[in-house]
Amino acid sequence: MLFALLSLAGLLAFRGNVVQDFPDIELPMITVSASLPGAAPAQLETELARKIEDAVATLAGVKNVYTTVLDGNVTTTVEFALEKSIPEAVNDVRDAVAGVRADLPGEMRDPTVSKASTAGRVVLTYTAQPAAGSSWDPQAVSWFVDNTVSKRLRAVRGVGAVKRVGGVSREVRVELHPDQMAALRVSAVDVSRRLKSVQQDAPGGRGDVGGAEQSVRTIATVQTAEDLALLDIPLADGRSVRLGEVASVSDTVAEPRSLATINGKTVVGFEVFRTKGAGELDVARGARAAVAELQAAHPQVLLTQVIDNAHPVQENFEGSMELLYEGAGLAVLVVLIFLRNWRATLVACAALPLSVIPTFLGLQYFGYTLNTVTLLSLALVVGVLVDDAIVEIENIERHLRMGKSPYQAAMEAADEIGMAVIATTFALVAVFLPTAFMGGVPGLFFKQFGWTAVIAILASLLVARLLTPMMAAYILQPHVPRADGQTDDPDGWMMR
C-alpha cells in the first residue's frame, strides 16, 4: 500500500510538473539602467556612468562592474560573488543608486534596478502583417500588437512579457522654426517647459461636488496635433504665442529603431517571453491558443509563427525519456541474463519503476522541474537502482538453495544482508551528493543533478529493504532437489 501511494503521488507529480530546457537559475548580477535622451556619450560618462559606478563599487561582495553607454542610455552591470544573497544585492544596489540620485541630472528618468535570470527567454516569435485586401497600414498593425495582442498574451499563464520587434510608434513631432522664434523672441526653453507642463497629470486635491467630497485631478493632455498647435506659450514679458506660429506640428510616426522582415517583406514581429518557473511547452501551448483566437477575431491581420524555441525543448524531453526507458530495458535484460530466473528478475527489477516514479514526487517537493539536468541524472542512475534489490534477491536465492521455504529464505536473507545493502546505498549517496554542493555557475545547475540522483538512490534502498523481501516471499518458488540430492541448478556455460 505504501509503494502504491508513493507511485500514484509520483505519477501525479510527473503530470503536474513543468517541462523546461534547463533549470532556472539566478546569478548575483544586478543591472542599473539610466536614460538621458539626447545626451552625448561624453556627458553620459561624466554625469551618469562614473557616479553610478562609484556608488556601487564599494558595496560588499562586488567582483566586477561593467558599464555600457549607448544612444542616451547607460547600463551598469554589477557582478557580485556567488555567495551573495540576490535580494540583499538588489537592495544594496538600489540604496546606492538612490544615494546619488540627487547628484544626477534632474531631467533624467529615474534609474531602474533589475536582476539577471535565465528564466526570461523567448519561447515563440510571431510576425503580424496586413492580410490580403486589408486597409491596415504599419501604424495600425503596430498598435494592434501593442494593445490587443500584448494584453491577450499577457493573460496566458506563464507569459512574462510580449515585446514588439519592428513596426512604428505614433509620434507628435514639433519642428521649431528658428527665424520665427527669433522674430517673436521665443526660446526653445520656453517651448520645452510648456510642452512638459501640458503633458503632466497631477492631483488637484478634493472638492465638494453635489454635496459629496470628490477627488480632483488636473489633466493637461492634448489629443491631436491640431490641439497642440493651438497651445499658448507664455513668455517672460507677459506675451504669449501659439506653438503653431513658431513650429510645425505634425501627427506622424517615430523613427524606427528596429526592423523585422520575412522573405524580404517588412512586417511587425513580436516575441513571447516566459516567466520564472514556467515551462516552455505550457507557455507555447497557451500562446498558440491565444494567437489562434486573435487570428479568428481579426481576419484583417495575418499572424504567422516564425520561431519556435519550445520545439527543441520537446525533442530534448522526449529524447531524455527515451534514454531513461532504454537504460531501464537494458538493466532488466542484464539482470535476466545473469539471474537466469524470470521470477527473480521480476522481483529485482520492480525496484526500477518503484524508485524512479516516487522520485518525481521529490522533485516537485524541492521545486525542481523536468529538465535536461534532472532527466539526465535519472538516466545515469537507473542502472544502479537495482543494485540493492539484486543483492537482496541473490542472497534470498542462496537461502532457497539450502532447502528453505521462500518466506523463511526472504526473512533470514534480508536480515543477514541488511547492513551491506545500507552501506552500498550510502556509498553511492556519498558519490553523488557532493555534486549538489559544487561551487561556481556550474554548481547552480548540478545542484538539481545531485539531489535527483540521491532521491532516486534512497528510494531504491527503501524498495530493497521493504518490498523486495516481501515480493520474494510470495513470488519465488522453493528449489526442488535433484536426483543427486543437490538443490543447486547447473550453472551452464555462461557462469563457467
Please give the residue ranges for each predicted region.
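Interfacial helix-loop-helix hairpins and adjacent transmembrane helices
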Residues: 1, 407-411, 441-447, 466-496
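Hydrophobic, glycine/alanine-rich multi-pass transmembrane helices and their short helix-loop junctions
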Residues: 333-338, 356-373, 422-473
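Helix-loop junctions and hydrophobic alpha-helical segments within the transmembrane domains
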Residues: 306, 313, 317, 393, ...
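Hydrophobic alpha-helical transmembrane segments of multi-pass small-molecule transporters/permeases
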Residues: 35, 47, 79, 273, ...
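Alpha-helical transmembrane segments and their helix-entry boundary regions
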Residues: 162, 181, 315, 344-347, ...
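Internal alpha-helical transmembrane segments of multi-pass membrane proteins, especially GPCRs
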Residues: 317-325, 347-350, 378, 414, ...
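Hydrophobic transmembrane alpha-helices and their membrane-interface caps
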Residues: 10-16, 21, 329-398, 405, ...
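Membrane-proximal extracytoplasmic
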Residues: 1-329, 337-338, 370, 444
